Amino acid sequence: MKKIAIIGAGISGLFIANLFKENPDYQITIYEKNTSINIDEGYGVQLSTNSIKLLNRIGFNTLEIKDKFNPEKIDFFVIKQEKKICDLNISEFNSEDCKYTTLKRSKLVEFLKDGLKDDIIKYDHNIEKIEKNNDQIDLSFNKNIKAICDYLIISDGVFSKGKSLISNNKIKPAYNNSIAIRGNISRNKIQNLNQNNISLFMGRNFHYVIYPVNKENEKLNFIGVLEYQLTANELDNYSLFKKKTFIQSIKDKLKNELSITILENIENIKCFPVFVSKGYLKPGKNIFLLGDAFFAFPPSFAQGASQSIEGASELFENIINNKNSFYDYRVAKVKMINNRSKLNHFAFHASNPIIIFFRNISLKLLTKNKKFLENYLGKIYKN
């Protein structure tokens, strides 16, 4: 029996553990640095059909209907006029069992966690050293805890300590000159929006998205991305982003970019600096990276969670079939999505009136062009 160690109990780590749990040839252990998994936050996540198909293999289709939502379209708006430009029918990529889905991230994590036995996840295990020892991998954690594995899967997020250890701290994420703003907003505070769809608003160096996270009458999810310069000292002071003064400064900056009705009614606001990957790391034999540890995308294509799931499925198939194609295939897919994310960011944040004019015309045409959509979205949404 081969031992698999997974560093990090995020979406990718939990999902691949669910795939391996029924295979008697492998023993899985997840090492999580925190003392528990936070399933209290109500912020949303979008899952396109490529990941729903994979999640259904472990019973996601049995999740209660009330706990998830299937939007049919993305409605595009210009912030200034609050004027709808066009819509994109994302349901065209749906099948009977695989539909574009939004839900609370905590609900997805809870589902993945509940699929595993309690003893699979070891909490309060902070990785400190990774060493290759012939065909085995030696792991050292805090409190002098040691472990040995045959395969090591590093899935501990964008600031991956595991990745830093195997790269000798040479590969780090880069600040993307933008702040992500998360929150919730009551349905009765929103007017002139189809609350059955995803609403995407484009502005000057800023865009935001509002969407439902379940079929109950709960608050809508709000996520905005604002271009914002930070000094090195500010980036090192992560507690800064939790301070009320900083959050208020962001809200003040948005007064000219966002309708007062929405701005004043966003609840549970949290701000995060957006970090992205700038390169790829190919680890040694039997060591793998997943999720944001593999590559962190700019948040303009809503593929972070879906790619964590898809990458985990690819790695699972590679390991059980003793293949070596995981890295090259994943890099090719990631490059495709990263390029689309950058293009989306440019389009959503355009400030030049001429560029905005042609962007709006292009959106009206391209959102109805099936050949374009099959190439731009179909290559991502279908696996």
Tell where the protein language model's regions lie, with residue ranges.
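Conserved N-terminal helical subregion
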Residues: 4, 21, 48-186, 229-234, ...
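Conserved mid-domain beta->alpha element of the FAD-binding
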Residues: 5-21, 153-154, 181, 245-246, ...
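Conserved Rossmann-like nucleotide-cofactor binding loop
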Residues: 12, 36, 159
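Glycine-rich FAD pyrophosphate-binding loop
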Residues: 21-41
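Conserved N-terminal glycine-rich FAD pyrophosphate-binding loop of Rossmann-like flavoproteins
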Residues: 36-54
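Conserved FAD/dinucleotide-binding core of flavoprotein oxidoreductases
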Residues: 86-100, 104-105, 109, 189-268
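C-terminal auxiliary extensions adjacent to catalytic cores
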Residues: 360-383
